[in-house]
Amino acid sequence: MRYLLELSFNGANYHGWQIQPKSVSVQEIIEKCLSIILNEKISIVGAGRTDSGVHASYFCAHFDYSNLIVNKLDFIYKSNSFLPFDISIKNLFEVKDDFHARFGALSRTYQYKLNTFKDPFLANSSYYLKKDIDFYKMNLAALKLYNYQDFKCFSKSNSDVNTFNCIITNASWTFKENHWVFEISANRFLRNMVRAIVGTLIEIGEGKHKINHLDSVIKSKSREEAGYSVPAQGLYLTNIIYPKNTLLDE
């Protein structure tokens, strides 16, 4: 049977989601945990490959298991007892055998948290920017993202992908809980895309470029023309949407 896990994790202590040689990953930790609890070798497939230090307040993964998990609350309790403090299983659902946590997603939402005041307790959870920036200009620039689909300029160099096209459905800055938060939703994202977009918008907010600079960057299709990649600790995956009737439990 195939199961869908809903979980969250603080990425500060991990080299991203995906298993890597000689590095600790979120995927590796969860697979070891589930294999012990279910007494069977378990492999999980995540909804995406978050980079080192990136967090997820909402993340999904699927795995196959030969038996029916009858008591799901007990499974969740045991899983969280085994897992470290910075990874939490939230829910478990039965799904169709052809469900895929990564390729089945219709959209994803990321948030990037930025604070303009120094707080040592936020060092691993947001980006502290010392300079004054104009968030109004940054919001105007962000609106331009809706006009394009090819975002090669924001993709990590030498990315091995079939297409650089993404359909952005939301992109805006808001002030929440003493943070400036950039929220962006799209049908798919390129590697390093969100952090590069945020870095480019910050340079516009700092006055280094005019708002229309974003048009030139996107049309150039060159990573060198875009802004810097902001630090990983401010980035969160916050939502994933799947087609209706994905869950067999419903």
Task: Label the model's feature ranges.
Residues 1-250:
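Structured-RNA-binding interfaces characteristic of tRNA pseudouridine synthases
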